[in-house]
Every structure is written in C-alpha cells, then in structure tokens.
C-alpha cells in the first residue's frame, strides 16, 4: 500500500531520528515546518527536555506585520533561535530536519542560525 505525503514524511523522520541523538554537550535542533509557520527547538534527548524554543508564531510585534510562510520569516526565526541559545550557552547542535528536505525554509533557518554563530 502506498504511503501518502504525511506518512512518508513521518517515516523519513523516524529513520533520521534513529541516527540523530542530542546530548547535553551537543543537543538536537529540531525543525518543524507547517504550511503557515515554522517551529524550531533545541532538545536534550538524554534528559528529555526542551532547552530553547521559538517559532514564527511568537515573533515580536514589529516583525509580526510581515509574517508570511517564506524564507525571510525562517531566517528571522533562525537568528532568534541562535541568539536565545547563545544566552543559554549552547553553541554546537545536531541538526534534525524533521523528515523535510534541506531546501527552502528549512535551509534558510539553518543558514541563519549558522551565520548567527551556531555550529552544526
């Protein structure tokens, strides 16, 4: 039986999660992309806690005027996530693309986080 698009993405994400494990010294940067928003969080899998989280839903009011599901919004979220993680002392992470291709909004978020000082 053929899988639909959502089932295929979940299957890919499970396959990637078998290989990608976040630790206390190098937590996991998990990205989820929906049709309207993009969400990113840094997770320590050994303790099972979220250390830092941000999304396009909770951007500042001055930035929320231009919230559209595009690469510019993803860059703002990536930069904001990197700034928050630097305050927490997190510099190196393992990137988990959530079963999506490393292209478009996912790539824009990752590149913005790298430019802001995070290491993958």
Curated annotation (Swiss-Prot):
It holds the Pfam family Ribosomal_L18p. Gene3D superfamilies: 3.30.420.100. One of its GO terms (cellular component) is ribonucleoprotein complex. InterPro entries: Ribosomal_uL18_bac-type (IPR004389), Ribosomal_uL18_bac/euk (IPR005484). One of its GO terms (molecular function) is 5S rRNA binding. Keywords: Chloroplast, Plastid, Ribonucleoprotein, Ribosomal protein, RNA-binding, rRNA-binding. Its main location: plastid. GO terms for biological process: translation. Transmembrane segments: none annotated. Coiled coil: none annotated. It is found in: Plastid, Chloroplast. Part of the 50S ribosomal subunit; contacts the 5S rRNA. Belongs to the universal ribosomal protein uL18 family. Binds 5S rRNA, forms part of the central protuberance of the 50S subunit. This is Large ribosomal subunit protein uL18c. It comes from Pyropia yezoensis.
